[in-house]
């Protein structure tokens, strides 16, 4: 309250707290969002309290961490704890929402959260319970409609999906995550996955991962705007050439199938995400 220089604002905060039985943080936030108009702020609060609620019970968050933490390591939630966490959220491991949570928690390792990642992540989201996180998830997913935020989410996924200490992502894992993050965004998704499984069969480098988003965003249905002299990874050059040689760009073909469904191979590869919550793997990889 001392941060408020205006006595009028301080009085409105006290009045708001008395009326709504909320805390000071919520009162200040709601009044600020409504230009310090008391009647408007109180009406909007009662219509949508979840939006304005800003009081956090940090002890409650710490208790949640204790519920899921690894018995052998008190400073992290391991794979089994994450599975328990996802079960409480009614989420499957290969759900995009799981990846969004990891993104918001700034998780560094797949299938686990450090104590700081979990507690700070919950605090940053302004939530202190599973039910509140459930309510928040659709809002977080909508953030991906912003191109800048989606790009950040997409780049985060590379670091999250690769094994610690490795420079690239195992091919099957890369395909699995591409099917999650680029579904509905890359018209050649299924054909890309088919090409990789038939012709590449190696790990995916950061450069290829990052630039595929630019390719997916800008390429037209006929790939007629592809610049083979541009600074594209060789793998994407090879993909375009392969599509042209194998008539994947014929008028009667359906390159947009990636928008509609996942290929059976891609769907199968997503099992790797679920299995990653059960075991950890170390693999020697070649990069492309």
UniProtKB/Swiss-Prot annotation:
InterPro entries: DCN-prot (IPR014764), DCN1-like_PONY (IPR042460), PONY_dom (IPR005176), UBA-like_sf (IPR009060). Disruption phenotype: Viable but with decreased survival. Adults display abnormal locomotor behavior and mutant females produce less offspring with wild-type males. Third instar larvae display a reduced response to touch. No gross morphological defects. Ubiquitous, but likely imbalanced, RNAi-mediated knockdown is lethal. RNAi-mediated knockdown in embryo eye primordial cells, produces small, rough eyes,. RNAi-mediated knockdown in the middle wing patch, results in a significant reduction in the L3-L4 distance due to a decrease in cell number, whereas cell size is unaffected. It comes from the Eukaryota. Residues 56-244 form the DCUN1 domain. GO terms for biological process: cell competition in a multicellular organism; positive regulation of protein neddylation; protein neddylation. Residues 9-46 form the UBA-like domain. Interacts with the cullin cul-5. GO terms for cellular component: cytoplasm; nucleus; ubiquitin ligase complex. Keywords: Nucleus, Ubl conjugation pathway. Residues 249-288 are annotated as: Disordered. The lineage of its organism: Eukaryota, Metazoa, Ecdysozoa, Arthropoda, Hexapoda. This is DCN1-like protein 1. Residues 254-278 have a biased composition (Low complexity). The gene is SCCRO. It comes from Drosophila melanogaster. It is found in: Nucleus. Its main location: nucleus.
């Amino acid at each position: 309250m001392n941060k408020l220089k205006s006595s009028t604002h301080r009085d409105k905060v006290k009045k708001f707290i008395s009326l709504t039985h909320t805390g000071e943080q919520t009162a200040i936030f709601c009044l600020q969002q409504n230009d310090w108009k008391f009647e408007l702020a109180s009406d909007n609060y009662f219509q949508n309290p979840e939006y304005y609620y800003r009081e956090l019970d940090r002890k409650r968050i710490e208790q949640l961490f204790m519920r899921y933490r690894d018995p052998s390591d008190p400073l992290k939630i391991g794979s089994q704890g994450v599975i328990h966490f996802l079960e409480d959220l009614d989420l499957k491991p290969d759900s995009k929402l799981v990846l969004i949570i990891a993104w918001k928690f700034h998780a560094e390792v797949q299938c686990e959260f450090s104590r700081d990642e979990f507690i700070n992540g919950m605090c940053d989201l302004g939530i202190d319970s599973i039910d509140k996180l459930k309510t928040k998830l659709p809002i977080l997913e909508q953030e991906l409609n912003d191109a800048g935020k989606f790009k950040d989410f997409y780049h985060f996924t590379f670091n999250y999906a690769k094994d610690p200490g490795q420079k690239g992502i195992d091919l099957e894992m890369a395909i699995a995550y591409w099917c999650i993050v680029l579904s509905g965004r890359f018209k050649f998704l299924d054909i890309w996955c088919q090409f990789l499984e038939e012709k590449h069969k190696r790990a995916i480098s950061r450069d290829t991962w990052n630039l595929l988003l630019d390719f997916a965003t800008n390429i037209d249905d006929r790939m007629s705007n592809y610049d083979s002299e541009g600074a594209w990874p060789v793998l994407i050059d090879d993909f375009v050439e392969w599509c042209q040689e194998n008539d994947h760009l014929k008028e009667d073909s359906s390159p947009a199938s990636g928008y509609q469904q996942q290929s059976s191979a891609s769907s199968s590869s997503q099992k790797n995400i679920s299995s990653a919550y059960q075991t950890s793997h170390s693999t020697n990889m070649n990069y492309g």
